[in-house]
Every structure is written in C-alpha cells, then in structure tokens.
Amino acid sequence: MKRFLAVGIVAVSALALVVASAVAARSQDRSPTKHVLLLSVDGLHQSDVVWFVNHNPKSALAALVRRGVEFANAQSPFPSDSFPGMVGQVTGGNPSSTGIYYDDSWNTELLPAGTTSCDCVKPGVEVTYFEQLDKNPLALDAGQGLPDLPGGILKMTGAPKSLIDETQLPVDPKTCKPVFPHQYLKVNTIFEVARNAGLRTAWSDKHTAYEVLNGPSGTGIQDLFTPEINSEAPTPGSPIDWTNDNALTMQYDCYKVQAVLNEINGYDHSGASKVGTPAIFGMNFQTVSTAEKLPASNGLTGGYLSDGVTPGPLLSRALVYVDTQVGKFSQAIRDQHLDDSTVIILSAKHAQSPQNPLALTRIPTARSSTRSTPRGSRRVTRATWSRSRSTTTRC
C-alpha cells in the first residue's frame, strides 16, 4: 500500500524509511541539523498530497513539498497498519526483522497473559498490544485518574508504561514475567540512538502500547504522551470513542498538536517543565484516517469521490485541518529561531484502500456502547453512528 513520504534532508542515517522537508529553503545552507520533527498523517496517500498541493499552492504542505525532497514511491510495511508502520519508520525494519507484525497477533512461544506459575504451562498466546493494555481503556488518560478530562489531558504522564495493566501482557516462559511492548521489539529505534548520543527525545501517539517505540532498552523516549483514542468521547459515559466522529478526532489530535507545540517551545508535552526542544520528536494524526473510513460525519460524506482520487467533503476538511497544524508547527519553529537547524519529516504509518468508493464494501456494525464491550474483544468502529455537531475544531 503506497504511503506519502515528503522529505528534504535525511538528518539521521537511521531514518532510512522516512524523508524530510526543511522549514526554510536550505539548498545553500550548511547549518547543522539539531532537531527532527516527525509527523505521521495516518491514511495519507501520495495522490492526496498531489491533489492538495495542486489545489492549495500557498499551503503549508505545499511549502514543505516545494522546499524539500519528495519520495513518491515509498511503501508501508506488510501487513500495513499503525503498529507495524510506526515501528518501521523508527527502526528501518520490516515485520520479519522487528518482530512486530500487528498489534493483535499470535505468539507460539510466550505464555498466556496472567500466568504467574510457569511450570508445565503450554505456550501460545494472543498478544494484544492495543487499548486493551490500558488500566482503564475507556478513559482518555488510560486510567491515570486525572480529574479534569478531556481538557486537562496534557497533565497525563510522559511515562505510560505505568498505565499498562500487566495482567494483560503475555508472559516470558524463561523469566515468568510479563513482556511489555518494548521488550517484544527485536531491534533498536532512532530514539535509542539519540539517547545514546545524549540527545532529548519525545513522541505523541494513540495508545499506551506505543511504549514499544522506547525500543528494547525501554528508555528510548523521555517524554511519551499517549492519550487513549479509543476511550469514551468526548466525556466519560459516551457511547462512542474519538474515532467515531471526525470532529472529535480533530479535537483528539489537537491535544497532541499542543503537546508538540509545547515541545518546540522547549517544554515537556504538558508545558509545565522547561527541558529544551527535543532532538527527535513528533506525533501521528488520526483525522485524515477517520475521514477516509467514516461513510459520513458532521453532515459531510467521507472518503473519496467516484474517481477514487478526489477527496470528498469530509476528507477535504481533514486535509485542510492537517495543513493548518503543519503551518502552526512551522511558525513555532521560526518563532523559536530553530528554522535553520530543524528538519520536518512528513510521512504516514499507512494509507487506506480501496480509495474508489465503488470498490469498497462496508460491513454493517452494531451500535452498541463501548462500555459494554468485554475486555479482550477489540472495539469495532461504529461507522453507522452520526450526529449533528460543529464542523470546526479549535486547537
């Protein structure tokens, strides 16, 4: 499945699968790169970028493409999904080398979750590295217990390993201890490379299970912000999560946008502690992804028009939203006088297919509440759900 990778200068050799676009034109600039901002726009296709830039030549995305270097034939790993895709970007590996095929897989060597006495236990376990790991998968803070959600989510810990329910983890038969996501990964990450060089690292993603990006050391990311995207949204008790309504997805992405802006300004993700701008940091956007998946949301049709290339009204709005946030990042970098030392990497963990709506067959889904979903069963996006709400979301 083709994904988009927009780049200019490859600042770190470990970034083998991604590319970057400098904030300012740098053809004559030999300033050393000190900061790399990696942005994954989940669901973004090469054709989306071409369409958007052609129709919005003065946009922030157009500026990145114009001033940077574009790799138009990049491919996502197979299988193509968020977990293996993100791991691929920060390791340069594919599932056969990283050991990460999917966030829900079968392992023939590990023991079932919850095993405490490992003698004579038959190996074989479903490894579920998604929202099921959260101490409270229905809470935006994954069970931390913050009092003022969703508005206070930036107070969420930057060490989400503490929010993982160890009884949901597979067990190593050799040690009889739970295997955290970072221990499941077979290779190191760019975050670990940076840490070994004495550099600061940060990242924002959608589940606590993304502590996998810490790498085998478990310490690759110093500030990891992981608000739970499949939690009840926008407030506790809601029958939907942040993916069931595109305006809610934008609101969710805004929390991560603010975290990155805080980091550009030299603070931790919460904006409370002055720690310096990270050497490697970034986030993933979900807004484009849900705009492609949802048949309709906020009174707008999702996906593409009949040509399979032109974004429909919901997806067009999502692309404008992402462009606006990229513009904010670029401006913040300039405001901090970091534009001569920063590279922006615009990419995607995965795309989505088919783009042609005539080739898409939707499977009807139940409209049951997420609260009634038993633990151990993956929640299903209730794509048939819709309601009238504002079509704008402020970051």
For each predicted feature, which ranges?
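Bacterial N-terminal signal peptides
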Residues: 8-18
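C-terminal region of N-terminal signal peptides and the immediate post-cleavage residues
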Residues: 17-30
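Beta-strand elements within well-structured catalytic alpha/beta cores of enzymes
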Residues: 33-46, 63-65, 89, 194, ...
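Short, structured active-site-proximal loop/turn typified by the sulfatase FGly-forming signature C/S-X-P-X-R
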Residues: 49-99, 200-202
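Secreted, luminal/periplasmic, and some membrane-associated catalytic domains
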Residues: 56, 72, 79-81, 100-159, ...
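Acidic, His- and aromatic-enriched active-site or binding-groove loops in soluble protein domains
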Residues: 91-104, 202, 218-267, 304-324, ...
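Catalytic-site neighborhoods of secreted/periplasmic enzymes
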Residues: 138-173, 178-239
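Active-site His/acidic residue clusters
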Residues: 207-208, 212-230, 268-321, 358-360
